[in-house]
Amino acid sequence: MAAPPASMSAAPSPLQSAVAPDVPGRQAEQNETACEDRSNAGTLDRLLPPVGTGRSPRKRTTSQCKSEPPLLRTSKRTIYTAGRPPWYNEHGTQSKEAFAIGLGGGSASGKTTVARMIIEALDVPWVVLLSMDSFYKVLTQQQQEQAACNNFNFDHPDAFDFDLIISTLKKLKQGRSVQVPIYDFTTHSRKKDWKTLYGANVIIFEGIMAFADKTLLELLDMKIFVDTDSDIRLVRRLRRDISERGRDIEGVIKQYNKFVKPAFDQYIQPTMRLADIVVPRGSGNTVAIDLIVQHVHSQLEERELSVRAALASAHQCHPLPQTLSVLKSTPQVRGMHTIIRDKETSRDEFIFYSKRLMRLLIEHALSFLPFQDCTVQTPQGQDYVGKCYAGKQITGVSILRAGETMEPALRAVCKDVRIGTILIQTNQLTGEPELHYLRLPKDISDDHVILMDCTVSTGAAAMMAVRVLLDHDVPEDKIFLLSLLMAEMGVHSVAYAFPRVRIITTAVDKRVNDLFRIIPGIGNFGDRYFGTDAVPDGSDDDEAATVG
């Protein structure tokens, strides 16, 4: 019943931050069968278009989550193919918290199954399943000995770490990243490695004591009690504890009669009156589950935000912020800008001079890091008073795909720098940025983070990336946003929402056109750099795939 891993953070599936439990089903079997049929039909060559004499440009990928099914199911897992829309307003703050559903009920009543059915029926991305089983307190040596003999009461409110539960749920509702313990029921202890959860639009919290704490109740937007016959619950508990938790039948029955049943009568069943919805028969009650799903959908519609339009209409005619630093426009810098802005420039020259500018930009950005006095001894035995970096560590985070091109320049000047990536794409139907994927190094909250994107026009993607870093507890004044070219609109948007973020670029252009493209601009940087510049719609910057 432990919650499935979310992070992003973890091993980078292209949509790893979209958390969902394993949902086997008929559709999953059909998808897997179809995949097997295609793989058996022939070699990879049969799946590729014929190669002609001319070079065929690759197509950029954009999100269309409102016109395509947002799910890809296999027999083992559910992957959300739609990105996460903005969860903050144009001020960079979260205007509405994630929707939290509490699932209570007796042990083995089917809470986890009901939760998974709700997730499957919702068909929306970014759902987090949080299990109360992960929050059992760490047992003392004496308590572990009692638990090994089935003499410890795990069905009492005192067995749970409610302080950790409440703080974790609060952070999730605020959109922040959290670390969740993994409880080992075989050894009755927490495992060393905790799992990361992040990016919840909907939180489903389930557990036997889900309604046992007043503060916890106030965090739940919807409370559901799963009511199942006691005999069925006993059979399920026997099967689960014997097969999954290494117990014997005598020990399970002893524990049930001594602790589980009395705890249900004393602590759990009375909380049924606190529930908004009571689901008899658990997962077999499809009518109740459909009603729950309809209500959650209506709540999500009320939480939809439109950020990009608000950015376009704000901050007109304001002076450039003091947090902006533009690389000195020397003849050399202007000469390189002339080359990369020229539409006739070959791809090789575009890459060469872009890399030169990136190197200069990174070197310029490093001068804003904190330094302190230090003394070293020269080979001549003399003291030299100089400077050394006063921070803990430098981490680079690139906004895919164009921002990835700046990573080599950062690695060239920062030894052993850690690198993370964030993928943000535009939904063509809504025009809003959507978070599809992130992979961030562990423990970045004390690092100075260099956030890299080659062009910033409206600032929508940059704002989303900064918001992700803040959700992972990176201080705002330790974030440096680097870009080769920015529009004034993007500079104002980021600076207004995050006034302590340092913005560093090689040039700032005045205008953004009606299609939110920088004028005069540089063209679509990613297409020109990666050789995918023949785009039918005539896009002239990376916004067609990634919101700048």
Curated annotation (Swiss-Prot):
Residues the record lists as binding ATP: G105, G106, S107, A108, S109, G110, K111, T112
Biased composition (Low complexity): 1-18
Reaction catalysed by this enzyme: uridine + ATP = UMP + ADP + H(+); cytidine + ATP = CMP + ADP + H(+)
Record's keyword terms, sorted: ATP-binding, Cytoplasm, Kinase, Nucleotide-binding, Nucleus, Phosphoprotein, Transferase, Ubl conjugation
SUPFAM superfamilies attached to this UniProt entry: P-loop containing nucleoside triphosphate hydrolases (SSF52540), PRTase-like (SSF53271)
One GO term (biological process): UMP salvage
Metabolic or biological pathway: Pyrimidine metabolism; UMP biosynthesis via salvage pathway; UMP from uridine: step 1/1
Pfam family, one: UPRTase
Subunit structure: Interacts with RNF19B.
UniProt xrefs under PANTHER family: URIDINE KINASE
Protein function: May contribute to UTP accumulation needed for blast transformation and proliferation.
Family indicated by similarity: Belongs to the uridine kinase family.
Protein name: Uridine-cytidine kinase-like 1
Natural source organism: Mus musculus
